[in-house]
Amino acid sequence: MIDSTAFWAKEYKLGGFRFDLMALHDIETMNLLTAKLKTINEGIVVYGEPWDAGGSSLTGNFAAKQTNGNRFEGYGQFNDQARDALIKSGMNGKADKGWVNNSTSAASP
């Protein structure tokens, strides 16, 4: 994964990578991958979905998941809690309002 993304960044001059289900990867690999990419392009963007679709063999502090975000080095994650507080509706087929849609009960982002 590290070699592949480095190749694509060099060869195709890609400016960023987005990882679906990033929590299926371990933090160490994601940190190494990001560090390698930053040597190629210090402004490269790396981010992903910090969830695992309901299961992973990685346990505790090893997975690149939302609750371990403080250990991410140089890359980011989606924040579904902030998203839901801001826009709410549409994510689960509900018509609930979020903060942006003038909800008075939505948590502040």
Indicate where each model-derived feature is located.
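Active-site groove signature of glycoside hydrolases
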Residues: 1-25
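Active-site-proximal helices and loops of the catalytic beta/alpha 8
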Residues: 21-109
